Structures are given as C-alpha cells and as structure tokens.
C-alpha cells in the first residue's frame, strides 16, 4: 500500500508521474497489485491494466488507458519489444529477480531505465546469495552511480578471488570492510525494515 500511496500522490497531487509500469511475479502482478487498489479507498482513483496472459490479451491490455500497467517479469522482455508507451516511473516488485546481469529481463530493464524518471525496487532478500547480487539490482536503480557501471568495477573494488584453478576464478569473497563500505554507498536510496520494527510478537 505504501508504494501505491506514493504513486497516487505523485500522480494526482504533485503531477510528477503520468504512467507507471509495475513488474512482478505472475501471481503478484495478476492478483495482488489489483487487489490492493480495490481494497483502499484513497487508491480508488488509480486505474490499472494487467498485462498478462496470451499475446492477444497482453496487446489488448496495453491498448487500454490506465495509470498503472502491471506485467509479470516473464513478459518484461516482450513488453519492452512491443510496447510503444512511455513510462516515467517503474516499480520492480521482487528486485532480487534482477540480480543476474546476464539475464534477458535485466538487459531489457537496463535498456528501458534511462527513459524512466523514477524507479523503486521492492524485495525481502536483496542479497540472498551474497553481496555480489547487489550490483545488478542497484545498476538498475541508479544506473551505476553508487556501485559502478560495470560488474568488473564492482568486483575489483570490493572483492578478491576465493575459489580458483590457476587463472580461472570460480568465486569471490568480500574484502575486509567491504560489506560496510557497500551498505554505506547505497544507504541514501535504501530503506530497510526489520520484522521487529513493525510486528508485535505474542
């Protein structure tokens, strides 16, 4: 709800945003986001079009006038190739699904990113497999401003080879102090919530 409230304010109070793309897992894109819009009175003026299903259904959804266009991440590459709409804001729901810089969805979002004024990434596991995951995610958020434009730059700054066979490196480990340095770099655009901050346990 917090993200949708912010979108509503940007769209109808400050008029800074006109069309928003939301990318998420299929069930979340198809069910959760539209349900949140229906649930809260202050969000009822926001309209959405859910871009899922067959190619025909997706094309029809893109032709429908809406404030929010919600697509499942598996169809992001298709959307970037077939959609002529301009989005001035993007929400990546489950940002960690963009952690692989070799994946087609990362490349599609990277190409779209310079055209977008605002971007928000939501995730419960930003570095599920370690700090190396963070580079691709923040490359999309700030276009390389904080952790570098290239993975090699990030790797050389904060990591050292771990498992290797001669000149072939299989894995990397953080340099001493790297974790704190990385978190300090991204702190100004990162909000981290702990369960203990907002859950009342019995």
Regions found by a protein language model. Give the residues of each.
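Walker B catalytic acidic pair
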Residues: 93-94
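Conserved Walker A/P-loop ATP-binding site and its immediately adjacent core
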Residues: 2, 17-39, 128-133
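Walker A/P-loop NTP-binding motif
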Residues: 1-16, 108-110, 141
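Conserved helix-turn-beta segment of the N-terminal RecA-like "Helicase ATP-binding" lobe
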Residues: 28-53, 141-144
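Conserved P-loop NTPase motor "coupling/switch" region that bridges the ATPase
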Residues: 45, 89, 106-198
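Conserved helicase motor
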Residues: 27, 48-58, 73-78, 99-102
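Conserved helix/coil segment N-terminal to the catalytic DExD/H
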Residues: 55-89
């Amino acid at each position: 709800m917090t993200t949708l409230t912010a979108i509503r304010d940007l769209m109808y109070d400050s008029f800074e945003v006109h069309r928003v793309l939301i990318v998420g897992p299929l069930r979340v894109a198809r069910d959760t986001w539209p349900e949140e819009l229906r649930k809260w009175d202050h969000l009822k003026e926001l309209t959405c079009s859910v871009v899922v299903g067959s190619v025909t259904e997706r094309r029809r959804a893109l032709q429908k006038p809406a404030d929010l266009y919600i697509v499942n991440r598996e169809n992001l590459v298709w959307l970037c190739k077939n959609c002529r709409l301009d989005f001035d804001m993007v929400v990546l729901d489950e940002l960690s699904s963009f952690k692989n810089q070799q994946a087609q969805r990362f490349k599609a979002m990277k190409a779209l990113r310079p055209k977008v004024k605002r971007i928000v990434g939501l995730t419960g596991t930003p570095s599920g497999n370690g700090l190396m995951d963070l580079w691709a995610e923040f490359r999309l958020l700030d276009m390389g401003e904080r952790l570098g434009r290239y993975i090699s730059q990030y790797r050389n700054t904060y990591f050292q080879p771990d498992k290797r066979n001669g000149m072939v490196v299989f894995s990397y480990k953080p340099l001493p102090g790297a974790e704190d340095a990385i978190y300090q770099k991204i702190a100004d655009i990162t909000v981290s919530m702990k369960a203990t901050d907002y859950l009342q346990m019995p």
